[in-house]
Design a protein with these regions (language model features):
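Terminal-region recognition feature
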Residues: 1-212
Length: 212
């Protein structure tokens, strides 16, 4: 089976919080979950279902009798090299269908698949020195010749969907996308704001205390 992974070649997980004592870690997670804050600080994988999607669905259920503009927003803090594209597309579907506002906050590195999640936030914030990466990812396939051909044909459809999402969610046009798609295109938050990737830069357009 083919594995479609979108991470830069230097990809690492950022699970440093797990090195804390269990009690401290659990206390921090509960504190932020109670504030409807989700933390993406590792590679994107199948755990998005129980870690993020289920919570977004639950909060939408809790809010079903509240007008969308009166609901407590959900905030997703993102510091990730990216990861599995199938899991990424599923989480994007959940975010897009959420009637409860979902705010994404870029911090550190927002790369590849994590970048696609970020741009689908209803309101997109970033710290000044947040680094974004848009690229074509990495494909790992170990299968028969015919199955590889089948997957590559399907991969073209995936690329079309990714392109359409970027063109829809940002100010990036088709020409600029085509010129940068097969490159490792890194940029900071100020360039992201110019490209329509970032809505607000923390410390310039919004204060940190106003996010939560």
């Amino acid at each position: 089976m083919a594995e479609l992974t979108l991470v830069p070649e230097v990809g690492n997980t950022f699970s440093f919080m797990e090195e804390m004592g269990t009690g401290v870690y659990d206390e921090l997670m509960k504190y932020y979950t109670d504030k409807r804050v989700l933390i993406v600080n590792k590679d994107i994988d199948n755990s998005v279902i129980e870690s993020y999607a289920i919570r977004i669905l639950r909060w939408n259920d809790e809010d079903k009798n509240i007008p969308s503009d009166k609901r407590q927003p959900i905030t997703i803090l993102i510091h990730s090299c990216g990861g599995d594209l199938f899991s990424t597309l599923f989480l994007i579907d959940i975010i897009k269908q959420s009637k409860t506002p979902v705010h994404t906050v870029g911090m550190g590195l927002v790369a590849s698949a994590a970048y696609y999640i970020y741009i689908n936030g209803h309101d997109r914030l970033a710290f000044e020195n947040t680094v974004f990466l848009q690229h074509d990812g990495t494909i790992s396939i170990a299968d028969s010749n015919s199955k590889v051909k089948d997957f590559m044909a399907f991969n073209d459809l995936m690329e079309d969907r990714i392109k359409e999402s970027i063109l829809t969610q940002t100010k990036i046009d088709s020409d600029f996308y085509d010129k940068t798609f097969d490159k490792e295109y890194y940029f900071f938050a100020d360039k992201g704001k110019e490209l329509g990737v970032v809505d607000k830069i923390i410390g310039q357009d919004i204060e940190l205390a106003d996010i939560f």
